[in-house]
Design a protein with these regions (language model features):
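N-terminal Rossmann-like or analogous alpha/beta NTP/dinucleotide-binding catalytic cores
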Residues: 2-130, 134, 225-226, 230-243, ...
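Short secondary-structure transition/capping segments
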Residues: 94-109, 133-139, 162-170, 290-305
Length: 326
């Protein structure tokens, strides 16, 4: 299966619909902001729209106060969206915590195809089994529970509630990423059977984003390179559910000068702190400089970057945040 995803045209028959899809588990940091800026520019430079979706599947870790703050931060930066979040719109709900019934419908379609099975393995068991890992650090599931009989499932269910996985074939998925170029993954070898639903009933990221992007009319997904390895799984889900797949562009990660990934948990360069030191235009301009969109870190508004935006300018390698840039 091949999904072309090259963003080169300034005008298209149907303008693209991009999206912001932050997880409100803390304040936005520079890496989140850079990805949001690129998503906004990619869509706006071709006359497109932006949807804001709040990815709060785990509601306990994502209090609504953080969702409200990230809306304020995006608005302050000038990254205005057209629908979603607290603004609402025709494709709601826009908060994943409110979409369980919608996800259940798609989950049931996959279950009806005979592709879903219960998994009783713990994370500790998987790591102890020395199974191979995906490029994003997750364990590639070795299929331990794939062939359980009905009797075995009934017996194990007495002791532990299962999670549920999607069975994948030994098949290559090939697509052309709008930033990273051609990419191929084998579903069985590189991904493995993956979670659709946790043991506590919460739906997994892979299913939720596919269902949401399709029902919201998203035609291009711009996100961090750490999610590149999710794309093959999601393209497979689009096919199984009979949904149109968007184009993808995975932007390089923004790293601290010492090579660490920026983290909400560590408070790295959070917008809460940056707003006390810089104007919105200074932050946008310095991020644009770091990502090759302008030759110097001069203050810029997002709108001023639209005419000259091109994915050809964006590096393919992770970007080390220059010392003293922020």
């Amino acid at each position: 299966m091949q999904e072309q995803a090259v963003f080169t045209q300034k005008t298209e028959p149907v303008p693209p619909t991009g999206r912001f899809a932050p997880s409100p588990s803390g304040r936005l940091h520079l890496g989140n902001l850079a990805c949001s800026l690129l998503a906004w520019l990619s869509a706006r430079s071709r006359g497109g729209r932006i949807v804001l979706r709040i990815e709060d599947l785990d509601a306990e870790r994502c209090p609504r106060v953080y969702a409200d703050l990230l809306e304020q931060d995006l608005d302050w930066l000038g990254l205005v969206w057209d629908e979603g979040g607290s603004h609402g719109g025709p494709h709601g709900p826009y908060y994943q915590s409110e979409c369980a019934a919608i996800y259940t419908e798609s989950y049931n379609k996959l279950e009806a195809q005979g592709l879903v099975y219960p998994c009783f393995c713990s994370r500790a068991q998987l790591h102890a089994a020395s199974a191979p890992h995906t490029s994003d650090g997750n364990v590639i599931y070795p299929g331990t529970c794939r062939g359980l009989t009905a009797e075995q499932i009934a017996e194990k269910s007495k002791k532990k509630a299962p999670a549920y996985r999607l069975m994948v074939p030994d098949e290559d998925i090939t697509f052309t990423d709008g930033c990273m170029g051609p990419h191929t993954e084998n579903l069985l070898r590189d991904c493995g059977d993956f979670y659709l639903r946790r043991a506590d009933g919460v739906f997994a990221y892979q299913l939720a984003v596919v269902v949401d992007d399709a029902r919201m009319g998203v035609t291009e997904v711009v996100r961090g390179a750490d999610l590149l390895s999710s794309t093959a799984r999601q393209l497979y889900l689009y096919r199984l559910l009979g949904l149109p797949a968007p184009k993808f562009a995975h932007c390089p990660l923004l790293l601290a000068p010492d090579g660490r990934r920026l983290s909400k948990r560590d408070g790295d360069q959070s917008l809460e702190n940056l707003r006390a030191k810089y104007t919105a235009q200074e932050i946008v301009g310095r991020l644009a400089f770091a990502y090759g969109l302008q030759p110097e870190p001069a203050p810029r508004t997002p709108e001023s970057l639209i005419p000259d935006f091109s994915w050809d300018k964006v590096p393919k390698q992770d970007i080390y945040l220059p010392e003293n840039l922020f």
